[in-house]
Amino acid sequence: MNRIAYFLLIAVVLVGCKSSKRLTATKVPEVTASEAAIPSYLASRLQLTIPGKGGSMSVGGTMKMKSRERVQISLLMPILRTELARIEVTPTEVLFVDRMNKRFVRATKNELKEILSKNVEFSQLEKLLTDASKPGGKTELSGKDLGIPKLEKAKVQLYDFSTKELSITPTEVTSRYRQVSLEELMKMLVALL
């Protein structure tokens, strides 16, 4: 009888030690080598210089990027650090908000084909910004480098990079802003040169 009780006790202990959790396999999404080279987040400060007829105009700002989602550029007024303009680029569209004149342009990838170099893609912008953040990378980009030949004289200097996680809230345009055409915006920008 003792032997049976002893075996039952061992059986109960062994059954009680069995894990109730089951192992399941989860699929890890495949990432290409070029995607793996791009950090999930990238931020930097920037200096935009636009040479004009009466000299050049420079303005500072910030750049934030969440890979494969959006790039947000804020151009800030010197000293006061008030936002003058915001440019938000996603894989499908570009939003340019002129905070000073309360106007904006929202253009799709197809609408931008007229002013951008051929085959300009969001992934190319990500690669340019990522390469600039690497030691020895090209940190001064021209309008031509960015795929905007009409603004080839403009220069963007990127510095003070960070790959820490950050929050990028999509830009919402309120009814106080007036939508203008892409052609009107380009005329205004080219007139500065």
List PLM regions with ranges.
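Bacterial signal peptide processing site
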Residues: 18-21
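Sec-dependent signal peptide recognition
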Residues: 2-8
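C-terminal motif of bacterial Sec signal peptides marking the signal peptidase cleavage site
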Residues: 13-16
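Extended beta-sheet lipid-handling architectures
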Residues: 41-46, 56-63, 75, 82, ...
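An acidic-aromatic
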Residues: 72-119
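Flexible, processing/modification-adjacent segments and terminal tails
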Residues: 99-147
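Non-transmembrane domains of secretory- and envelope-associated proteins
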Residues: 98, 137-193
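Post-signal peptide N-terminal segment of mature Sec-exported envelope proteins
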Residues: 24-49
